[in-house]
Amino acid sequence: MSARNETGYERVLVPVGDKSDPNMLTELSSILVDPRRGAVRFTHVTTDRSFVGSQENWRTGSDSVAESQHTLREEGIESTGTIRTASSALDGILEEAEEYEADAILIGWTDKDSVSSLVDKLLRKAGCDVIVFSADRDPIDTDSILVPVVVKPDANRLQMLAIMSQRTGASITFTYVTGDEGTDEEGRGLLDQSAERLAEYGVQAETELKSASSAVDALGQLSEDYDVMVIGTSRGWWLRKTLFGRKTDKIAQEAQCSLLMHKWQGEVPPES
């Protein structure tokens, strides 16, 4: 991520499949990359080493990469493309990220019924920010962003939120759901602190304190009024302990809007 007074990631890696971009990662990358000196690399990883399979994968992968590059070129954003053969999709993405010196990887969350094994391992092993996105609509058309908070927000996440808001004109609302694990006093303190810190990045946020017996149900209901919900991985890999798996999957199923999961580089989860 660029310095505070600058605007976006400098090197964004976007793995693409052999189909169209169902989660609109190309559009999301155009929002998050620094338009002045940033660049995006699209990569397609093939694991089929047979001649026929490899040829077909290279062809379809090349088409996907070229299509994404064309979209960004029309927006004046620098981009490159690669096709990589690796023992697994995970290895190929990690190798490409290291060679490219990516400061963020964007990957799609296609099946909202569960977090895939690939995404789980990528969140654990990538040495940069990882952004997992499930698109309900074009992210460029985002007007409102909902951000549930459970701990003091990290500077990396605040900067990403500020970039999204400034590029799209979207409003940001921090929300805290009180219930079994939190009190109104704790919630108000976190909400005020989150809004104050985001203001340091030039973005004013709204706050909402909600009381509910089920945070999952409450967030699902709240999400109906927003375009994107951003969840993170705080509290010492809190996402893995209380959201990742059951709760994350349930939140994804209940969400009535696009869902963005953000892991910043400094979050290092324990091994399973």
Curated annotation (Swiss-Prot):
<dbReference type="InterPro" id="IPR006016">
    <property type="entry name" value="UspA"/>
</dbReference>
<comment type="function">
    <text>Has probably an essential function in the transcriptional regulation of the kdpFABCQ operon.</text>
</comment>
<keyword id="KW-0346">Stress response</keyword>
<dbReference type="Pfam" id="PF00582">
    <property type="entry name" value="Usp"/>
</dbReference>
<protein>
    <recommendedName>
        <fullName>Probable Kdp system regulatory protein KdpQ</fullName>
    </recommendedName>
</protein>
<keyword id="KW-0614">Plasmid</keyword>
<comment type="similarity">
    <text>Belongs to the universal stress protein A family.</text>
</comment>
